[in-house]
Amino acid sequence: MFKHEKRMLQEVKVERPNPQYAAMLQEQLGGPNGELKAGLQYISQSFRIKDPAIKDLFMDIGAEELSHMEMVAQTINLLNGHAVDVGSVDAGEIETHTLGGLAPMLVNASGAPWSANYVNVTGDIAADLLSNIAAEQGAKVVYEYLYRQINDRYVRQTIDFLLNREEAHNALFREALNRVQNKGSNKDFGVTEDSKLYFDLSSPTPPNHFNAPNPTPPGFKNPTQPGQ
């Protein structure tokens, strides 16, 4: 069950309207590394998870991502101002001014519509967790790019909060991956000789080249316990 609380996860505001910044932020609303993609991906993946704690983790983070989506959309709304003006956007998405009446739309920074193809669901807990770790890392990278280019201190505060939450989610998914070392596609990992071969097809071979692997299930040091 979901419910809507009439407050933001964290307050958002802007120094002044800037439709160009709004167009840039559309990437994290309707893009492949955006908040809608993340929320729907984690919630969709949760439906087949049997471990109650991991299922709750996916649902909790998915619900938080939808709260992030609300923050991004409201920031875009404030940056768009009060009058449609295509000329205020030097590059990127202009559908907001030609079609959406300044409403935040489910498109990326170039105006391409959001797609369910962005959502990765395999039904395999290990594969889904690795996909989610990559998704959180990718979202953090996009927020870092936006932070460098948006010169609005309040928008930067919002971006800083969001990218730090991506780091938290990344750490939680890594901890969950450590709990499923013998489940799903992690089971019987690296048990044949074929999995231990390395084909050196590059010539000449550099001095720091890779050698034949010794596959073990993907895992991480426990990110919530730095000493481990």
Predicted regions and their residues:
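Non-heme di-metal
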Residues: 1-228
